[in-house]
């Protein structure tokens, strides 16, 4: 059992240690051998730790390169879309000036910020769609919240009601989310589960 442990921990280095003990011929060979093996084990662990850290640093470096490339691609895509929008607005302006109508100028919005807003609103509405509102009422009070559409807690929302949730404009979806937050502030005991 001891030989298996030594072979597993030190491998061929044990033979090297015994050869060194034979060459040096210290006064206490067992103590010398123990010191040599302890030192070898300590340096082997340090080398393994350094190797693992280098691997981790290499992974982090590769991930940061990927993120940098993705950010650059998104910037290029945003620039291309912005240029397309400017080109379309320019052509629309030329067409309108040829016809004689002058519409109000439309401000150009950053595509990235509008995409982020849309993604944020979609994530918020998905959370509302996945978890139906569960409201607790105090004894003697009504379960109705003024100005909020009510659902029966025992019935599943129908497919048509789910479709209605998805067909609203971002402003309507945002308005519904704000209404829900206001309702929770008005009735603090009726919080939905996280």
From Swiss-Prot:
Give the superkingdom in one word: Eukaryota
Q: Where is the composition biased (Low complexity)?
A: 149-163
Could you tell me which Pfam families the record lists for this protein?
Answer: Dpy-30
Record protein name field: DPY30 domain-containing protein 2
Member of which family?
Belongs to the dpy-30 family.
GO CC list? Set1C/COMPASS complex
Query: Which species does the entry assign this protein to?
Result: Bos taurus
- Region feature Disordered, mapped onto this chain: 126-172
Gene symbol of the encoding locus:
DYDC2
